[in-house]
Regions:
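N-terminal Rossmann NAD(P)H-binding glycine-rich loop of SDR-like oxidoreductase domains
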Residues: 6-28
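NAD(P)H-binding glycine-rich loop region in Rossmannoid oxidoreductase-like domains
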Residues: 40-98, 102-105, 117-121
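Conserved catalytic-site region of short-chain dehydrogenase/reductase
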Residues: 82, 117-129, 153-158
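Short alpha-helix in the Rossmann-fold core of NAD(P)-dependent oxidoreductases
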Residues: 89-93, 112, 131
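Substrate-positioning beta->alpha
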Residues: 98, 159-160, 179-200, 207-211
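Conserved beta-loop-beta element that borders a ligand/cofactor-binding pocket
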Residues: 115, 135-157
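Mid/C-terminal beta-alpha module of Rossmann-like enzyme folds, strongest
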Residues: 199-262, 276-309
């Protein structure tokens, strides 16, 4: 897909990553049709002058209608936790199947699909199992597909960063799982958006799966230290919580709380996290992602405001 007049269907356009992807595609002169759930149709994208298609990836008919007249699709929809009818199976598997079917029906050949770093590594969680099923659906689609597996994505609008900022800003020590040696490889949301925009036009990436992470590999302890230093201008103390105790607490909270601080699956994913080799993506897309701390410093004011600090 190289025509400047091409229209791109973007699912998840109102989300954290979607907001940046849509802005990047429009900056590069591409027309965007945003698939937006009816309860979000009056937020953000409409004010930006986007073409809105109301629908839900779980509803095949609405996705099929949204895909008509498009030449490419970027599928970004995903959830980290299940809520009611928004289950991993419904959103990741059924939703991706509906997007693939809609692309086929509408003659959309190019599909760039967002998965997650850790998919395909055998981590036994509902999140990763369904991400892997979604990847299989894309690979078997017959389309010109590219799969992108980002690590933790950071930016001032992201719920993860907002919650982490609030955590380090609380009074008292920052709690760690064990010694806090779990690994993060944060990648900036604007670099992820740039990568998606390049992938749409770079057909050499078709049929490939790319792990995408930032250049810095941080322990959870060092991640918190960086947040405190940049956002608060000071160091924080830590409280190491034994992993078995965290595991037991997560299990109990999952059974008694509607929105627990951490779920057993999330804890398993954190414990199983491993860094990725960033070289294949850097070679394919022609750039290195930005380092974490200077980028965080550049948007620190926005993040403080978003977190209410």
């Amino acid at each position: 897909m190289s025509e400047s007049t091409a229209k791109v269907l973007v699912t998840g356009a109102t989300g954290f990553v979607g907001h940046s992807v849509v802005a990047r595609l429009r900056q590069e002169g591409l027309a965007v049709r945003a698939l937006v759930r009816p309860d979000r149709a009056r937020r953000g994208p409409e004010a930006e002058g986007l073409e809105i298609a109301e629908g839900d990836v779980r509803d095949a008919a609405s996705v099929a209608e949204a895909a008509r007249g498009c030449q490419a699709a970027v599928h970004l929809v995903g959830i980290l936790r299940e809520h009611g009818e928004q289950t991993f199976q419904a959103v990741h598997v059924t939703g991706t199947g509906n997007v693939v079917a809609a692309c086929r029906s509408a003659g959309v050949r190019r599909l760039v699909h967002m998965s997650a770093l850790g998919a395909g590594r055998g981590t036994d969680t509902g999140y990763f199992r369904t991400k892997e099923e979604a990847e299989a659906c894309v690979r078997q689609s017959g389309l010109d597909w590219t799969i992108v597996r980002p690590a933790v994505i950071h930016g001032p609008r992201g719920e993860f960063m907002i919650q982490m900022a609030r955590l380090v800003a609380r009074r008292g020590p920052v709690p760690l799982v064990g010694r806090g040696l779990q690994v993060l490889q944060p990648v900036w949301v604007e670099d992820v958006a740039r990568l998606f925009a390049i992938a749409l036009r770079r057909h050499a990436t078709a049929g490939q799966t790319y792990d995408v992470g930032g250049p810095d590999i941080l322990t959870l302890r060092d991640f918190y230290r960086t947040l405190a230093r940049v956002l608060l201008g000071r160091e924080k103390r830590f409280a190491a919580v034994p992993t078995p105790l965290v595991r037991a607490g997560a299990w109990l909270a999952a059974h008694v709380a509607s929105n627990p601080p951490v779920t057993p699956d999330e804890l398993r994913m954190l414990q199983a996290a491993r860094p990725c080799d960033t070289r294949p993506a850097a070679e394919a897309f022609g750039f290195e992602p930005a380092p974490f701390e200077p980028t965080l410093a550049a948007y620190a004011g926005e993040l403080r405001a978003a977190a209410g600090l």
